[in-house]
Amino acid sequence: MNIEDAVTAVTADANALTSCLGQPVVAYHVTEIMREADLEHARQMQLALMRRSIEALVDDGLEDAAAEQFASQFDGRVGSAWKLLHAADGVAH
C-alpha cells in the first residue's frame, strides 16, 4: 500500500466530513498522518483530526453522538490504513 492508496481508502466513505471540512483539507491531514513514521506522533495527529472532525460535523448540524460515532469510525480507518502502510517499515505498532 502506498500513501495515495491509503488516503483514498480512508476518505472513500467520509462524505459527511469532506462536505463540511472540504476534501482537500481532509486529504491533506490524512496524507500528513500517513507520512508520519513515528507511531506516537501519528496518533497525536490522528486525535487532533478526530477532535476537529467532531467539531466540524456538529457545526454542520450533526448531533454530538452521531458526530462522535462517525469520527470514531473515521479514526479507526485512519489507524488501520497507517498500520498497513507502515507494516513493512519495521515500525513498532
Predicted regions and their residues:
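Short intrinsically disordered terminal tails
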Residues: 1-9, 86-93
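N-terminal acidic leader/helix
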Residues: 6-44
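Short acidic alpha-helix initiation/capping motifs at coil-to-helix transition points
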Residues: 44-56
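Short, compact, well-ordered microdomains
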Residues: 59-85
